[in-house]
From Swiss-Prot:
The active site is at 50 (nucleophile). One of its GO terms (biological process) is protoporphyrinogen IX biosynthetic process. Its EC number is 1.2.1.70. Homodimer. During catalysis, the active site Cys acts as a nucleophile attacking the alpha-carbonyl group of tRNA-bound glutamate with the formation of a thioester intermediate between enzyme and glutamate, and the concomitant release of tRNA(Glu). The thioester intermediate is finally reduced by direct hydride transfer from NADPH, to form the product GSA. NADP(+) binds at residues 198-203. The gene is hemA. This is Glutamyl-tRNA reductase. Signal peptide: none annotated.
Amino acid sequence: MHISVVGLSHRTAPVEIRERLSIPEQTMETSLQSLRGNEQVLEASILSTCNRLEIYTLVRNPDLGVSAVSDFLSSHSGLETGELTPHLFSYHHEDAVDHLMRVAAGLDSLVLGEGQILSQVKKMMRLGQEHKSLGPILNRLLTQAVTTGKRVRSETNLGTGAVSISSAAVELAQLKLGQSRGLDHLVTLESEQIAVVGAGRMSRLLLQHLQAKGASGVVLLNRTVERAEQLSADFPDLPVQCRPLTDLDQYLSTCSLMFTSTAADDPIIDAARLAPLNRRSKLRLIDIGVPRNIAADAADVNGVESHDVDDLQEVVARNQEARQAMAREAEQLLQQEAQQFLEWWDSLEAVPTINQLRSSMESIRTEELQKALSRMGPDFSARERKVVEALSKGIINKILHTPVTQLRAPQTRQDRQQALRIVERLFDLEAS
Protein backbone atom coordinates (compact mmCIF):
# COMPACT_ATOMS: atom_id res chain seq x y z
CA MET A 1 0.00 0.00 0.00
CA HIS A 2 1.17 3.52 -0.78
CA ILE A 3 0.14 7.01 0.32
CA SER A 4 -0.15 9.41 -2.62
CA VAL A 5 -1.32 12.94 -3.28
CA VAL A 6 -2.26 14.34 -6.68
CA GLY A 7 -3.28 17.95 -7.05
CA LEU A 8 -2.72 21.46 -8.28
CA SER A 9 -2.39 24.82 -6.56
CA HIS A 10 -1.72 28.50 -7.11
CA ARG A 11 1.88 27.46 -7.73
CA THR A 12 1.06 25.17 -10.66
CA ALA A 13 -2.19 26.41 -12.21
CA PRO A 14 -3.88 29.77 -12.92
CA VAL A 15 -7.29 30.50 -11.45
CA GLU A 16 -9.08 29.69 -14.72
CA ILE A 17 -7.84 26.09 -14.38
CA ARG A 18 -8.31 25.85 -10.60
CA GLU A 19 -11.92 26.98 -10.76
CA ARG A 20 -12.79 24.12 -13.12
CA LEU A 21 -11.49 21.57 -10.64
CA SER A 22 -13.05 23.06 -7.52
CA ILE A 23 -15.23 20.54 -5.66
CA PRO A 24 -17.95 22.16 -3.50
CA GLU A 25 -19.05 20.49 -0.29
CA GLN A 26 -22.43 19.48 -1.72
CA THR A 27 -20.74 17.24 -4.32
CA MET A 28 -17.98 15.94 -2.04
CA GLU A 29 -19.74 12.67 -1.21
CA THR A 30 -20.24 11.82 -4.90
CA SER A 31 -16.62 12.67 -5.68
CA LEU A 32 -15.27 10.53 -2.85
CA GLN A 33 -17.51 7.63 -3.86
CA SER A 34 -16.26 7.93 -7.43
CA LEU A 35 -12.64 7.74 -6.27
CA ARG A 36 -13.31 4.82 -3.93
CA GLY A 37 -15.05 3.03 -6.77
CA ASN A 38 -11.67 2.49 -8.44
CA GLU A 39 -10.06 -0.79 -7.37
CA GLN A 40 -6.70 0.94 -6.95
CA VAL A 41 -8.01 3.39 -4.33
CA LEU A 42 -8.38 1.99 -0.81
CA GLU A 43 -8.87 5.29 1.04
CA ALA A 44 -9.44 8.85 -0.21
CA SER A 45 -9.73 12.42 1.03
CA ILE A 46 -10.16 15.71 -0.88
CA LEU A 47 -8.88 19.18 0.03
CA SER A 48 -10.62 21.83 -2.09
CA THR A 49 -9.93 25.53 -1.44
CA CYS A 50 -9.72 28.68 -3.52
CA ASN A 51 -6.01 28.11 -4.10
CA ARG A 52 -5.67 24.33 -4.30
CA LEU A 53 -7.31 21.01 -5.02
CA GLU A 54 -5.47 18.02 -3.57
CA ILE A 55 -6.58 14.39 -3.46
CA TYR A 56 -4.90 12.17 -0.87
CA THR A 57 -5.23 8.44 -1.40
CA LEU A 58 -4.05 5.11 -0.09
CA VAL A 59 -3.46 3.04 -3.22
CA ARG A 60 -2.27 -0.42 -4.18
CA ASN A 61 0.12 0.85 -6.85
CA PRO A 62 1.34 4.47 -6.94
CA ASP A 63 1.50 4.78 -10.74
CA LEU A 64 -1.92 3.23 -11.27
CA GLY A 65 -3.26 5.31 -8.38
CA VAL A 66 -2.04 8.56 -9.97
CA SER A 67 -3.62 7.50 -13.24
CA ALA A 68 -6.95 6.80 -11.51
CA VAL A 69 -6.98 10.20 -9.80
CA SER A 70 -5.92 12.00 -13.00
CA ASP A 71 -8.77 10.33 -14.89
CA PHE A 72 -11.20 11.44 -12.17
CA LEU A 73 -9.95 15.03 -12.35
CA SER A 74 -10.20 15.05 -16.14
CA SER A 75 -13.77 13.76 -16.00
CA HIS A 76 -14.74 16.20 -13.24
CA SER A 77 -13.26 19.27 -14.93
CA GLY A 78 -14.04 18.45 -18.55
CA LEU A 79 -10.37 19.05 -19.39
CA GLU A 80 -8.45 16.59 -21.51
CA THR A 81 -5.75 14.73 -19.61
CA GLY A 82 -3.06 16.27 -21.81
CA GLU A 83 -4.36 19.75 -21.00
CA LEU A 84 -4.58 19.02 -17.29
CA THR A 85 -1.35 17.09 -16.66
CA PRO A 86 1.09 20.05 -16.96
CA HIS A 87 -0.65 21.68 -13.99
CA LEU A 88 -0.68 18.61 -11.72
CA PHE A 89 1.84 17.53 -9.12
CA SER A 90 2.07 14.18 -7.35
CA TYR A 91 3.97 12.97 -4.30
CA HIS A 92 4.24 9.53 -2.74
CA HIS A 93 4.85 8.08 0.72
CA GLU A 94 7.34 10.28 2.69
CA ASP A 95 7.03 13.14 0.18
CA ALA A 96 3.22 13.02 0.35
CA VAL A 97 3.33 13.04 4.16
CA ASP A 98 5.78 15.98 4.21
CA HIS A 99 3.60 17.89 1.74
CA LEU A 100 0.44 17.54 3.83
CA MET A 101 2.28 18.66 6.96
CA ARG A 102 3.48 21.78 5.12
CA VAL A 103 -0.02 22.48 3.81
CA ALA A 104 -1.60 22.18 7.27
CA ALA A 105 1.07 24.47 8.72
CA GLY A 106 0.38 27.13 6.08
CA LEU A 107 3.88 26.84 4.62
CA ASP A 108 2.58 26.01 1.14
CA SER A 109 -0.08 28.74 1.11
CA LEU A 110 -0.14 31.78 -1.14
CA VAL A 111 -0.20 33.85 2.04
CA LEU A 112 2.56 32.17 4.05
CA GLY A 113 1.35 31.05 7.46
CA GLU A 114 -2.34 31.79 6.84
CA GLY A 115 -4.59 30.29 9.46
CA GLN A 116 -7.64 29.33 7.41
CA ILE A 117 -5.96 26.33 5.75
CA LEU A 118 -5.89 24.44 9.07
CA SER A 119 -9.68 24.74 9.32
CA GLN A 120 -9.91 23.46 5.75
CA VAL A 121 -7.73 20.42 6.57
CA LYS A 122 -9.99 19.72 9.57
CA LYS A 123 -12.99 19.97 7.26
CA MET A 124 -11.34 17.57 4.79
CA MET A 125 -10.95 15.02 7.58
CA ARG A 126 -14.52 15.53 8.83
CA LEU A 127 -16.02 15.05 5.37
CA GLY A 128 -13.89 11.96 4.76
CA GLN A 129 -15.11 10.48 8.03
CA GLU A 130 -18.74 11.40 7.36
CA HIS A 131 -18.68 9.88 3.88
CA LYS A 132 -16.67 6.84 5.04
CA SER A 133 -13.85 7.30 2.53
CA LEU A 134 -11.15 7.29 5.22
CA GLY A 135 -9.57 4.20 6.71
CA PRO A 136 -7.05 3.87 9.54
CA ILE A 137 -4.08 5.11 7.50
CA LEU A 138 -5.41 8.41 6.11
CA ASN A 139 -7.35 9.05 9.30
CA ARG A 140 -4.12 8.82 11.29
CA LEU A 141 -2.28 10.97 8.70
CA LEU A 142 -4.90 13.74 8.77
CA THR A 143 -5.01 13.69 12.56
CA GLN A 144 -1.22 14.10 12.61
CA ALA A 145 -1.47 16.96 10.09
CA VAL A 146 -4.01 18.81 12.24
CA THR A 147 -1.72 18.36 15.25
CA THR A 148 1.15 19.76 13.18
CA GLY A 149 -0.84 22.82 12.15
CA LYS A 150 -1.82 23.54 15.75
CA ARG A 151 1.75 23.15 17.02
CA VAL A 152 3.19 25.45 14.36
CA ARG A 153 0.72 28.17 15.27
CA SER A 154 1.18 27.82 19.02
CA GLU A 155 4.91 27.08 19.27
CA THR A 156 6.47 29.27 16.55
CA ASN A 157 6.35 32.91 15.52
CA LEU A 158 4.61 31.92 12.28
CA GLY A 159 1.36 31.92 14.24
CA THR A 160 1.90 35.53 15.30
CA GLY A 161 -0.21 37.92 13.27
CA ALA A 162 -1.13 35.16 10.83
CA VAL A 163 -2.80 36.44 7.69
CA SER A 164 -5.38 35.08 5.27
CA ILE A 165 -6.64 35.41 1.72
CA SER A 166 -9.27 37.84 3.00
CA SER A 167 -6.75 40.07 4.77
CA ALA A 168 -4.54 40.05 1.67
CA ALA A 169 -7.55 41.09 -0.43
CA VAL A 170 -8.23 44.07 1.85
CA GLU A 171 -4.54 44.97 1.77
CA LEU A 172 -4.59 44.77 -2.05
CA ALA A 173 -7.46 47.28 -2.07
CA GLN A 174 -5.45 49.61 0.18
CA LEU A 175 -2.38 49.23 -2.04
CA LYS A 176 -4.26 49.93 -5.29
CA LEU A 177 -6.02 52.90 -3.75
CA GLY A 178 -2.68 54.30 -2.64
CA GLN A 179 -1.11 53.73 -6.06
CA SER A 180 -3.99 55.62 -7.69
CA ARG A 181 -2.93 58.59 -5.56
CA GLY A 182 0.74 58.23 -6.45
CA LEU A 183 1.59 56.64 -3.11
CA ASP A 184 3.63 53.49 -2.49
CA HIS A 185 2.02 52.52 0.79
CA LEU A 186 -1.29 51.30 2.13
CA VAL A 187 -3.97 53.90 2.74
CA THR A 188 -7.07 53.94 4.91
CA LEU A 189 -10.40 52.80 3.51
CA GLU A 190 -12.38 55.31 5.56
CA SER A 191 -13.66 57.33 2.59
CA GLU A 192 -14.47 54.34 0.35
CA GLN A 193 -18.01 53.17 -0.38
CA ILE A 194 -17.57 49.43 0.13
CA ALA A 195 -19.73 46.42 -0.70
CA VAL A 196 -19.15 42.75 0.09
CA VAL A 197 -21.02 40.10 -1.88
CA GLY A 198 -21.60 36.83 -0.02
CA ALA A 199 -22.12 35.98 3.65
CA GLY A 200 -19.92 32.94 4.18
CA ARG A 201 -16.70 32.38 6.11
CA MET A 202 -14.53 34.39 3.71
CA SER A 203 -16.94 37.33 3.91
CA ARG A 204 -16.80 37.17 7.70
CA LEU A 205 -13.02 37.55 7.49
CA LEU A 206 -13.41 40.39 4.99
CA LEU A 207 -15.65 42.30 7.39
CA GLN A 208 -13.20 41.68 10.21
CA HIS A 209 -10.26 43.09 8.23
CA LEU A 210 -12.25 45.95 6.69
CA GLN A 211 -13.20 47.07 10.17
CA ALA A 212 -9.56 46.85 11.29
CA LYS A 213 -8.43 48.90 8.27
CA GLY A 214 -10.74 51.81 8.95
CA ALA A 215 -13.83 51.13 6.81
CA SER A 216 -16.61 53.50 7.87
CA GLY A 217 -19.38 51.21 6.62
CA VAL A 218 -20.12 48.23 4.39
CA VAL A 219 -23.05 47.07 2.27
CA LEU A 220 -23.42 43.28 2.60
CA LEU A 221 -25.28 41.65 -0.30
CA ASN A 222 -26.46 38.05 -0.17
CA ARG A 223 -29.12 35.85 -1.73
CA THR A 224 -30.78 35.55 1.67
CA VAL A 225 -30.83 38.79 3.66
CA GLU A 226 -31.41 36.83 6.89
CA ARG A 227 -28.00 35.19 6.64
CA ALA A 228 -26.36 38.55 5.95
CA GLU A 229 -28.08 39.99 9.03
CA GLN A 230 -26.83 37.10 11.16
CA LEU A 231 -23.29 37.83 10.00
CA SER A 232 -23.55 41.59 10.48
CA ALA A 233 -24.76 41.06 14.06
CA ASP A 234 -21.25 39.86 14.91
CA PHE A 235 -19.84 43.30 14.00
CA PRO A 236 -21.71 45.78 16.21
CA ASP A 237 -18.99 48.43 15.80
CA LEU A 238 -19.05 48.34 11.99
CA PRO A 239 -22.09 49.89 10.26
CA VAL A 240 -23.33 47.12 7.93
CA GLN A 241 -26.31 47.54 5.61
CA CYS A 242 -27.73 44.16 4.53
CA ARG A 243 -29.31 43.97 1.09
CA PRO A 244 -30.56 41.18 -1.22
CA LEU A 245 -28.37 40.14 -4.12
CA THR A 246 -31.06 41.43 -6.48
CA ASP A 247 -29.81 44.94 -5.57
CA LEU A 248 -26.35 44.15 -6.96
CA ASP A 249 -26.65 46.51 -9.97
CA GLN A 250 -27.55 49.41 -7.70
CA TYR A 251 -24.35 49.03 -5.71
CA LEU A 252 -22.23 48.33 -8.78
CA SER A 253 -23.35 51.81 -9.83
CA THR A 254 -22.61 53.58 -6.57
CA CYS A 255 -19.85 51.88 -4.60
CA SER A 256 -16.14 52.44 -5.20
CA LEU A 257 -14.87 49.10 -3.89
CA MET A 258 -16.54 45.70 -4.05
CA PHE A 259 -15.34 42.32 -2.77
CA THR A 260 -16.97 39.10 -3.96
CA SER A 261 -16.87 35.74 -2.23
CA THR A 262 -19.83 33.55 -3.09
CA ALA A 263 -20.23 29.86 -3.82
CA ALA A 264 -21.76 30.55 -7.26
CA ASP A 265 -20.66 28.14 -9.98
CA ASP A 266 -20.65 30.86 -12.65
CA PRO A 267 -19.65 34.55 -12.66
CA ILE A 268 -22.28 36.92 -11.27
CA ILE A 269 -20.56 40.04 -12.64
CA ASP A 270 -19.35 40.45 -16.22
CA ALA A 271 -18.84 43.12 -18.88
CA ALA A 272 -22.42 42.84 -20.09
CA ARG A 273 -23.66 43.71 -16.62
CA LEU A 274 -21.18 46.52 -16.01
CA ALA A 275 -21.20 48.32 -19.38
CA PRO A 276 -24.72 49.84 -19.13
CA LEU A 277 -24.00 51.39 -15.73
CA ASN A 278 -22.08 54.35 -17.25
CA ARG A 279 -20.04 54.96 -14.13
CA ARG A 280 -18.21 58.28 -13.82
CA SER A 281 -15.78 57.16 -11.11
CA LYS A 282 -13.45 54.19 -10.68
CA LEU A 283 -14.89 50.87 -9.50
CA ARG A 284 -12.44 48.39 -7.98
CA LEU A 285 -13.58 44.77 -7.95
CA ILE A 286 -11.68 42.19 -5.89
CA ASP A 287 -12.83 38.60 -6.35
CA ILE A 288 -11.64 35.92 -3.92
CA GLY A 289 -14.16 33.33 -5.05
CA VAL A 290 -13.14 30.08 -6.76
CA PRO A 291 -14.84 29.46 -9.13
CA ARG A 292 -14.54 33.15 -9.94
CA ASN A 293 -17.51 35.42 -9.24
CA ILE A 294 -16.27 38.06 -11.69
CA ALA A 295 -15.69 37.25 -15.36
CA ALA A 296 -12.35 38.12 -16.94
CA ASP A 297 -14.01 40.53 -19.38
CA ALA A 298 -15.10 42.81 -16.51
CA ALA A 299 -11.67 44.45 -16.67
CA ASP A 300 -12.38 45.53 -20.26
CA VAL A 301 -15.09 47.96 -19.16
CA ASN A 302 -14.00 51.60 -18.86
CA GLY A 303 -13.63 52.72 -15.27
CA VAL A 304 -13.47 49.17 -13.89
CA GLU A 305 -10.39 47.67 -12.26
CA SER A 306 -10.79 43.96 -11.58
CA HIS A 307 -8.60 41.61 -9.54
CA ASP A 308 -8.81 37.92 -8.64
CA VAL A 309 -6.97 35.68 -6.15
CA ASP A 310 -3.94 35.37 -8.41
CA ASP A 311 -3.38 39.13 -8.12
CA LEU A 312 -2.81 38.78 -4.38
CA GLN A 313 0.82 37.88 -5.16
CA GLU A 314 1.58 41.60 -5.29
CA VAL A 315 0.56 41.97 -1.65
CA VAL A 316 2.16 38.73 -0.55
CA ALA A 317 5.54 39.76 -1.99
CA ARG A 318 5.63 42.83 0.27
CA ASN A 319 5.94 40.86 3.50
CA GLN A 320 7.08 37.45 2.28
CA GLU A 321 10.71 37.83 3.36
CA ALA A 322 9.83 38.37 7.01
CA ARG A 323 7.40 35.46 7.03
CA GLN A 324 9.95 33.20 5.31
CA ALA A 325 12.25 33.71 8.28
CA MET A 326 9.40 32.72 10.60
CA ALA A 327 8.68 29.67 8.45
CA ARG A 328 12.17 28.34 8.98
CA GLU A 329 11.36 28.04 12.68
CA ALA A 330 8.59 25.60 11.82
CA GLU A 331 10.64 23.24 9.64
CA GLN A 332 12.13 21.20 12.49
CA LEU A 333 8.72 20.80 14.10
CA LEU A 334 7.25 19.61 10.78
CA GLN A 335 9.97 16.98 10.45
CA GLN A 336 9.23 15.70 13.96
CA GLU A 337 5.53 15.25 13.23
CA ALA A 338 6.13 13.67 9.82
CA GLN A 339 8.68 11.27 11.32
CA GLN A 340 6.26 10.29 14.05
CA PHE A 341 3.63 9.32 11.48
CA LEU A 342 6.13 7.47 9.29
CA GLU A 343 7.40 5.45 12.24
CA TRP A 344 3.83 4.44 13.05
CA TRP A 345 3.20 3.63 9.37
CA ASP A 346 6.36 1.52 9.12
CA SER A 347 5.49 -0.33 12.32
CA LEU A 348 2.32 -1.64 10.64
CA GLU A 349 4.56 -3.90 8.56
CA ALA A 350 5.09 -5.96 11.71
CA VAL A 351 1.38 -6.41 12.49
CA PRO A 352 0.75 -9.57 10.38
CA THR A 353 3.79 -11.32 11.88
CA ILE A 354 2.84 -10.22 15.41
CA ASN A 355 -0.72 -11.50 14.89
CA GLN A 356 0.60 -14.84 13.60
CA LEU A 357 2.98 -15.11 16.54
CA ARG A 358 0.20 -14.41 19.05
CA SER A 359 -2.09 -16.91 17.30
CA SER A 360 0.62 -19.59 17.34
CA MET A 361 1.34 -19.01 21.03
CA GLU A 362 -2.37 -19.05 21.84
CA SER A 363 -2.80 -22.41 20.07
CA ILE A 364 0.10 -23.88 22.05
CA ARG A 365 -1.24 -22.42 25.30
CA THR A 366 -4.74 -23.80 24.74
CA GLU A 367 -3.47 -27.24 23.74
CA GLU A 368 -1.09 -27.58 26.71
CA LEU A 369 -3.66 -26.18 29.13
CA GLN A 370 -6.22 -28.79 28.08
CA LYS A 371 -3.64 -31.55 28.55
CA ALA A 372 -2.82 -30.31 32.04
CA LEU A 373 -6.46 -29.91 33.06
CA SER A 374 -7.35 -33.40 31.83
CA ARG A 375 -4.68 -34.81 34.17
CA MET A 376 -6.06 -32.95 37.18
CA GLY A 377 -9.20 -35.03 37.32
CA PRO A 378 -12.69 -34.11 38.53
CA ASP A 379 -11.49 -32.86 41.92
CA PHE A 380 -9.95 -29.75 40.29
CA SER A 381 -12.49 -26.94 40.94
CA ALA A 382 -13.76 -24.42 38.41
CA ARG A 383 -12.06 -21.64 40.38
CA GLU A 384 -8.74 -23.46 40.25
CA ARG A 385 -9.15 -24.01 36.51
CA LYS A 386 -9.62 -20.24 36.04
CA VAL A 387 -6.50 -19.53 38.07
CA VAL A 388 -4.42 -21.92 35.97
CA GLU A 389 -5.84 -20.52 32.72
CA ALA A 390 -5.06 -16.95 33.82
CA LEU A 391 -1.55 -18.09 34.74
CA SER A 392 -1.01 -19.57 31.27
CA LYS A 393 -2.20 -16.38 29.59
CA GLY A 394 0.03 -14.26 31.81
CA ILE A 395 3.09 -16.35 30.96
CA ILE A 396 2.43 -16.04 27.21
CA ASN A 397 1.92 -12.27 27.47
CA LYS A 398 5.15 -11.86 29.44
CA ILE A 399 7.10 -13.94 26.94
CA LEU A 400 5.71 -12.01 23.94
CA HIS A 401 5.98 -8.51 25.42
CA THR A 402 9.65 -7.85 24.64
CA PRO A 403 9.79 -9.30 21.09
CA VAL A 404 6.52 -7.58 20.11
CA THR A 405 7.73 -4.26 21.53
CA GLN A 406 11.00 -4.59 19.61
CA LEU A 407 9.22 -5.43 16.35
CA ARG A 408 7.09 -2.30 16.71
CA ALA A 409 9.94 -0.02 17.82
CA PRO A 410 11.29 2.69 15.46
CA GLN A 411 14.02 1.24 13.24
CA THR A 412 15.11 1.19 9.63
CA ARG A 413 12.96 -0.80 7.24
CA GLN A 414 15.89 -3.13 6.54
CA ASP A 415 16.39 -3.87 10.25
CA ARG A 416 12.66 -4.42 10.79
CA GLN A 417 12.37 -6.78 7.83
CA GLN A 418 15.41 -8.73 9.05
CA ALA A 419 13.86 -9.05 12.52
CA LEU A 420 10.54 -10.19 11.02
CA ARG A 421 12.23 -12.88 8.92
CA ILE A 422 14.10 -14.17 11.98
CA VAL A 423 10.90 -14.39 14.04
CA GLU A 424 9.08 -16.11 11.18
CA ARG A 425 11.84 -18.71 10.86
CA LEU A 426 12.18 -19.31 14.62
CA PHE A 427 8.46 -19.86 15.13
CA ASP A 428 7.70 -21.43 11.73
CA LEU A 429 5.32 -18.64 10.69
CA GLU A 430 4.16 -17.80 7.17
CA ALA A 431 6.18 -14.98 5.60
CA SER A 432 4.22 -11.71 5.81
